[in-house]
């Protein structure tokens, strides 16, 4: 969550672990399940996963992620839920890393925050920058979008006969 002069703003991210790309996000004035559902819907729209594609959604035990509505939506999309252990940040290490980067690179650096709209717009800008320009060492010091493009281009290359 982010403190503003008008109250708190809650932010949720959905991350494609293979690509290390943020594929869904949402900011909200409340911490209700609907805002994390919106982030999930954005990710589903962006990725259009195949039903039965062995997709796993890992989250912490936040009330939004273990809610009936959220669990039902995962089941409808054919996604297997996986919930981490209580108090174990290593269970959700990538999400914890993304949240830490977001807070360091946006929230602490550019605050204090006036209102919801300021946080939402800054988050939009940061997600675009993160996906398309931020260099990530684990994927070869390239942005997530470029790493993903290279991977799919490699799959499309005809294999060389021996």
Label each PLM-derived region with a short phrase.
Residues 1-162:
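Charged DNA-binding/catalytic regions of mobile-element recombinases
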């Amino acid at each position: 969550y982010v403190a503003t002069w008008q109250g708190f703003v809650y932010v949720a991210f959905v991350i494609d672990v293979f690509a290390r790309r943020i594929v869904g996000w949402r900011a909200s004035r409340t911490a209700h399940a609907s805002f994390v559902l919106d982030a999930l819907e954005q990710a589903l729209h962006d990725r259009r996963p195949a039903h039965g594609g062995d997709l796993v959604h890992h989250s912490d035990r936040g009330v939004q992620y273990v809610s009936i509505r959220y669990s039902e939506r995962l089941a409808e999309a054919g996604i297997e839920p996986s919930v981490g252990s209580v108090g174990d940040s290593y269970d959700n290490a990538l999400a914890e890393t993304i949240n830490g980067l977001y807070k360091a690179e946006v929230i602490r650096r550019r605050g204090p925050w006036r209102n919801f709209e300021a946080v939402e717009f800054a988050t939009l800008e940061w997600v675009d920058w993160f996906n398309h320009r931020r260099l990530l060492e684990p994927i070869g010091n390239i942005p997530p979008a470029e790493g993903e493009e290279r991977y799919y281009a490699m799959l499309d290359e005809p294999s060389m006969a021996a």
